[in-house]
Amino acid sequence: MNRTDELRTARIDILVTPTELAQRYPVSSSVASHVTDSRRRIEKILNGEDPRLLVVIGPCSIHDLNAAMEYATQLQAQRQKHQARLEIVMRTYFEKPRTVVGWKGLISDPDLNGSYRVNYGLELARRLLLQVNELGVPTATEFLDMVTGQFIADLISWGAIGARTTESQIHREMASALSCPVGFKNGTDGNTRIAVDAIRASRASHMFLSPDKDGQMTIYQTSGNPYGHIIMRGGKKPNYHAEDIAAACDTLHEFDLPEHLVVDFSHGNCQKQHRRQLEVCDDICQQIRNGSTAIAGIMAESFLREGTQKIISGQPLIYGQSITDPCLNWEDTEVLLEKLAAAVDSRF
């Protein structure tokens, strides 16, 4: 009989189960309390109950645990400095959606060479999340598929659904199941309506299929996630200006949704010129000083060193520099946080 299935696949390895990985890297009671408490603080900000600003900041993607931990340690000092005005959360992205092809992140390819040691990548990701949370820094990530979230979601305080997947039904269903607040980015063309539709969908109960913690394919019923929100990330043109924020809030109001959102300083809003994140920051700070309550949070891409680098076989990487989108350096990060905290003073 002719084979009609698995004609274009080759098995690489057996995947570890979420339960097995969690047993190797368990969550302590103190970390569990930290994650729970940080989620509650973020929820209050998104509901307008807390006038502080959510700040999701960090490298475009994680590729070096040592550099990531150095960044996290410095970020914790900034958290303590600005805690009265800012709820700072570290961006810890392990999966990268690609427009065509490219490195897909630490979980898929931790060795950066196409060897796809996924079990090792999952181990590194969970280990880093534990260490960052143990420092007292909450973590944020993008949920890209139905499987990998089962390995790390218990350590995530804020999640994102990316511009390429906001319109996807299965991602909306997954968001309705997640235990953390979830932001939906507007489409790559700048369309914010798809993000509003995603918020509405994720607030509802859904049935969806996913592996459970033991790897058994399972039928889940979700209760819905009441903390979905828009991430304004720009598109063909930036959408961080006051009129863009007002238009998005009008759409939210139309559907009786909370008129609070997050502005991404990077991506379409900086037109892929990373230093423009500082210009976006200045504009957002002015909007906050002018009395805007719609801006509940911001996202920014920063690392220890400025810019980005390419992976070149046989050549060492520059420590603390991104291998995906270009980032601001640490000095600019401190300036950005100082400006945001000063602007939020006007809310008190």
Q: Which ranges hold each PLM region?
A:
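N- or domain-start disorder-to-order transition segments that initiate the globular core
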Residues: 5-46
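Active-site-facing alpha/beta catalytic cores
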Residues: 2-6, 85-240, 244-245, 267-268, ...
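Internal helix-turn-beta structural module
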Residues: 303-346
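Conserved phosphate/anionic-ligand binding catalytic regions in large, soluble enzymes, centered on
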Residues: 54-67, 325
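Gly-rich Lys/Arg/Thr-decorated short loops/hinges at beta-loop-alpha junctions or inter-strand turns
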Residues: 17-26, 222-234, 317
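Acidic (Asp/Glu)-rich catalytic clusters
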Residues: 46-49, 76-83, 129-136, 221-222, ...
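Conserved, mostly hydrophobic/aromatic
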Residues: 58, 263, 329
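Glycine-rich loop at the start of a catalytic domain that most often binds anionic cofactors/ligands
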Residues: 65-77, 100-107
